[in-house]
Amino acid sequence: MGQPRGQPRGQPIAHRRGSVIGALLLCALAGCAAPLRVQPSPAAPPLVGRETVNATLWMQRAAEYRISAEQVYGLAAERLTTTIAAPGTAAVEQQGADAATLARLPTAVIVDLDETILDNSFYQARRALAGAEFDDASWDAWMLEGAATAVPGAVAFLQAASRAGHRIFYLTNRSCPRGTAPGAACASRAATLRNLAALGVPGGADSDNLLQRGDRPEWNGSEKSSRRTWVAERYRIVALAGDDLHDFVDRAEYARRRAELAPLFGTRWFLLPNAMYGSWERAIVSGSCTPGMDAATCAAANIARKYALLDPAPAL
């Protein structure tokens, strides 16, 4: 019988296999194995719009989101007969006011609109699919559709608050083109009112209940204190609901008065979850875009800022 091909003469096959296995074992014990390859980081951040996909899907598909929203509004409905019914106010703009004067005022509940009453995750999904960020033109087109659905639990709470005798004000940073607010010429305002009426919220078709940014000259900014002050001059504000800290108080004021104001959450203030956008996100990307930057470059700068602020390690 001839010698097997490739085997050195005079060396049994079993002995050679044992030598190879032994060499491998020695190498492993000595730590001479090749180091694990670390995959390089991507050369560029994800496509514009992609970073909102998980948040949008969570709000559209997750049972946890629906449960969270219904839980907030369920608590608010329970509070209608306890803390909301008690003397006092939910508005920082009315704190320090004469108690007897407040007691004589009719009562009101102020709610934010987008992601508090109206679910705009469909708009966010469209922007993600298009690989684009928010812009005024696409947002205006979405508002004109009047197709937003209700945030889970919102309609039932508002109906209960209305039955309890509270007027509902819808305070929103939606706005009309300059020179048209708040008249019938503002198509987006009319579409918003139709949207609210179709959902069956109390007073949703009444234009006087919709307080948009820019409806009055002094309501020009995105801050909401001036509009709450307008309501506070006419009503005792017994509850606030929103998805952003600015729906309740200025962020800087809350930081100064946190110990004093925090107990209002869950008693007169009711905060809805929104991971898609908000003043928290604007604070993160503030300053990443510079004057003259085009939209694509600005979007890329915003994404780069977000990645730079990710914290991979807990503080020791």
Task: State each model region's role.
Residues 84-101, 166-173, 204-209, 241:
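Surface-exposed patches in mature extracellular/periplasmic domains of secreted proteins
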Residues 6-21:
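Bacterial N-terminal signal peptides that target proteins for export
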Residues 32-111, 289-316:
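Non-catalytic pre-domain segments flanking phosphatase-related domains
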Residues 19-31:
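Bacterial N-terminal signal peptides
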Residues 58-67, 140-148, 170-183, 214-218:
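Second-shell loop/turn segments in exported
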Residues 106, 117-159, 163:
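Active-site neighborhood of HAD-like aspartate-dependent phosphohydrolases
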